[in-house]
Structures are given as C-alpha cells and as structure tokens.
Amino acid sequence: MSLSPLFVGKSFGDLPGWSDDDHSAAFAAFHRSSFHVLTKPYRNGALGVDFSAFADAYAEARTVSPANRSPILDRTEARAFFERHFIPTLIRAETGGAGLVTGFYEPQVEASPVRTERFTVPLLSRPADLIDIDDSNRPPGLDPYLAFARQTPDGPVEYFDRGEIERGALGSKGLEIAWLADKVDAFFIHVQGAARLAMTDGRLARVTYAAKSGQRFTGPGRILSELGEIPLAQVTMQSIRAWFKAHPDRVDEILWQNRSYIFFREADVEDAALGPIAAAKVPLTPGRSIAVDRLLHTFGTPFYIDAPTLTAFDAKPFRRLMIAQDTGSAITGPARGDLFAGSGDAAGEIAGVVRNAADFYALVPRALVSGSNR
C-alpha cells in the first residue's frame, strides 16, 4: 500500500504552535490505542497509512505505564516520542482548501430505570430482528445505502424509521434501557451516539452506540434552515434547542424528517475523566480524541489540528495534537474531523459552537515517507 499524494510532507517547524502544545495529553490517548491493537489491529484507511507501520511506535508506547511513570510522559518526552516516530504531512480538503472541524460530546441527563409520569421517552437496545446488511446478503431492490435491515420470513426489508418507532412499532419488545424526560434530549443523545445517565436510583450509568435503523441522517439544523426558521450561519446545537423549546408542537414534525434511529447498549463508567469507548475501541480523551473518516484514515493516526479561529476550548487558538479514535456518518473527506469536547453540559456548550476551518497535519510513521530525515 502506497501513501496517497494527498499527503504533503512538512517539518515539525512548519506546524504553528507545535512546540507550545501539551504532547503528554496526546500521548496518553495514543497509549490507550497501543494496548488495544494487541487484541485487534486497526483496519487500513484507503489513503495508504498502513497500520503495520505503527508497530515501533506502539511497541515503545507500551513500555511506558502509569505504574512506573506518573504522568505517563512529561511534555518534553512526549514531544520527542512523536517527533522520533512520525513525519507531519499536510492534507487538504477535496476542494484543495482548508479542512473543517466540528465538535461532539457525551451528554449527561437525568434518567429513570422505569417509565413514570415524568420520564416517558425511552432509549432502546438493539432489536433481535435488526441485522447487518452488505453485498453478500442484500436482496434486490433494497437501498444499497442501507447497512442494516429487518429480518422477516420473506427476507430482509428496510427497518422501521424514527417516526414509526416513536409511534410504537417496537413498543412491545421490551427494549427500553432507560427513560428520559425530554424528547429533544433523547434526540441529541442519538446524534452524539453516547450519554451518561444520572439515574433516579442514584447510579451513574452510560449508554453507547449499538446499531441504527440504517436510513440516511438528516440534521434538524439543515431542515430548519431550509424552512427559513434559522439562518444557516446561525445553526448550532444551542440555536436548534432554543427553537424546539419555543415550538414544542413541531418537535415531531422536524425530528421525524431524520429517519435514522439509534439503538444503544449499556456500558460502565470506569473513569469519570474519560468519555465512552468509541469506534477505535478505546475510551475517548476530552480535547485529544478526534473522529475522522475511517474509510480514508487509519485509527490511531495522530493529527495536528491548526484551527486559529476556534477558541471555544480554552480561549486560545486551537492548535493541538489529536489521536484518531472515532468516526461518524457526517465525517467524510480527508480533511474533516470531529473534536471530542468531553462529557456533560460544559462540554456540550463547547461542542455545540465548533464549526471552524482548520489545517490538518497527519503524522504518518516515518517508514511510510521516503527521505524521512526531517
């Protein structure tokens, strides 16, 4: 596998703010991936960053453990680690211009283990009749986009969509994991793919993505913009929530236009400082994990993100080393990323306003770059 010409070799001196970053925080995220790959290697992305080329970096990372080092590495040591094993390469958007970053987070909401007068909106587990679909079992006539379907005696068919499910299509199957008080809260948990649940019985629980109904995602921001309700430039999670609060009678009308429905599984909250286990099978690190297009990029790849207009994280231009540890259906293209802001309302305030141009510097293993003496 050869490295895509989309990667343009640079030096670390070309990266704005590189020497000022806290590389130890990025190393902690990379360190978690280094142990997971012993169980299951990451799949190679189509742009040619071969997983096997990470072997030396992962092996060295695994020699450092919290048991013998705290912090795992200091900032200087972590910076030297990344400079020793990787070469920075600038990767542009398909248009040839800068890339785009948005933000995501793990909501935390109050929930009940049982339905009550107040808690009436369920989060559902994966139904038994929801099956994975690919070209090996897709029947003629089924939308080729669909990766999930409903198994019937006559074969796979398109699964129930959001409107059908919320009108009761699965109401008798006992799939309810927990009950929420607000349908809009539930929808944004679907968008984020995970949540912490402050249960009324005193427990702190977590749900994470298990599967989906399979239809295309249609964001409410786009719908409200096309209806003339919110100018496109003003669409944020906060503005969408405010519109729903002002128009409670139209919530179903808007949300049911997004036919995609998410199913969840229960998970433990093992470390309150970390997010949920994501697509790369490691817990997300606030401010250091990034979701990328997994068809193009290889999980575990470090990305240095230069987004000078983004100041929501710490009131300074966003220039940070991130580790590719998640993906998302809206995250497509070589220079497109979703930054994990953390858990809870404060993280949501950050994530909801992130939509900024950014330069993406993929740090690729030196073995993949000819003449890698930069």
What are these language model-derived features?
Residues P5-V8, S19, A25, D271-R374:
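C-terminal soluble interaction/assembly domains
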Residues P5-D268:
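Secretory/export targeting leaders with adjacent low-complexity proregions
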